[in-house]
Amino acid sequence: GDIGAHFRQAIGDLRHIHIWPENHTRNPAYEANIESLKTILENEGYAVTIGILDVEEGLPVSTQGAIPDLILLNNDLTSGPLPDLGVPILPPPQMGWYQRRKSDHFKAAQPLLDEVANLLDIDPWLLSTHWVVSEDKCLEKETCRTLLAAEVDNFLNHIQAKYDEFGIEGKPTLFVKNDSGTYGLGILEIQSGEELLNLSNRKMNRLTYGKGGTDAENFLIQEGVPSGLSWDSMVVEPVAYCANGRVGGWFYRANAKKGEMANLNSPSSIFISPSEIDDDSIRSRRNHWHMLVAEIAMLAMAAEAKN
C-alpha cells in the first residue's frame, strides 16, 4: 500500500519498525489508532513493536531485544527533541512541536494556496483562512490585550465582508489557540474583541495551559471555518491520513453536541469510518476540495521541514 511504499522509498530495505507513541494512553480512540497502524504495517510484512524507549541508554532496543530499522514517531515531541539514536526516524524529529509553530505552517502554505487558487480562478480565501499571531504573553497584559481586541474587531469585519460577498450566512468566529503544540484543551472561540477583553480567569488558565504543564506564550488567532457537513443529525468533518504527500485514507469526526462553527474535537466527539457514511455530496467534497487542501498542506509541511 501507500504507507509501505513510502517507507521503502524513504528508508530502503527494512524489516523491523518501532512505533513511538504519545506518553498518555487515556484516550481509547488513540490506542485503537495505534493498534490499527500496527496492523497496517504488519500486513505490509514488517515486524512491529510499540512503546516509549529510554533514550538515555543510547541506541533504542525493542521488546524483542533487537535494534529497529526505523522509528515511526507518533509523538508530537512537545516535551523536547530526541537525541541522536543512530536509527532513521520518520517523520523528521526536527518537526516536533518543541520548536514548530502553527503560524510557520500557514506561512509556508499561503503561497501554495495562492498559486492553486490562481490556477482555478477562485478567491484564495476560499481555500485558506486569515490569521494573526499574538506574541510574548500579550493576553496577560491589559494594554496589549486592548490593542489586540481592536485588531480582532477589524479582523472580524474583514471576514464579515467576505461572508457578504459570497452569500455565507452566520456570524464569523475566531479561534484562539497555542501557536505551538497539539494540545486541544486550550482552544477558545470568540466573536468580538470585547470577549477577548473580558476573558475569565478560568478561560485564561485553560488557554495558557500547554501539554505537559508548559505555559503557552504565543497564540494563533485564526478565522474559524464552518464545518459545512452533517450526517445523522451530527456535524461532521473529514480527517485525512497522508503519506508521501498523498492522502491515503480518511475518517470523520462527528459531534452531536456542537454546531458547525464550533471546535468538534471535544470529549463528546465520535469517529466514523467513511464506509458508514452513504452520502454522495460528502464523498464528492472529500475526494475533491478536502483532498486538494490536505495535499497542499503536505507540500507546506515539506517546505517547513526544509527550512
Give each language-model segment a name:
Residues 1-168:
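Conserved N-proximal alpha/beta basic substrate-recognition cap immediately N-terminal to
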Residues 23, 74-77, 178-181, 244-245:
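Short, flexible beta-strand-to-coil junctions
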Residues 33, 151, 195, 284-293:
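Short amphipathic alpha-helical segments
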Residues 49-53, 102-105, 120-124, 204-209, ...:
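Short C-terminal domain-edge/linker segments immediately following a structured domain
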Residues 124, 138-149, 232-234, 240-254, ...:
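Amphipathic, soluble alpha/beta structural segments
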Residues 128-132, 172, 177-179:
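A glycine-rich phosphate-binding loop feature that marks nucleotide/adenosyl-phosphate handling sites
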Residues 154-160, 166-173, 180, 185, ...:
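Phosphate-binding site of ATP-dependent enzymes
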Residues 246, 253-307:
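C-terminal active-site "lid" helix and adjoining low-complexity regulatory extension at the edge
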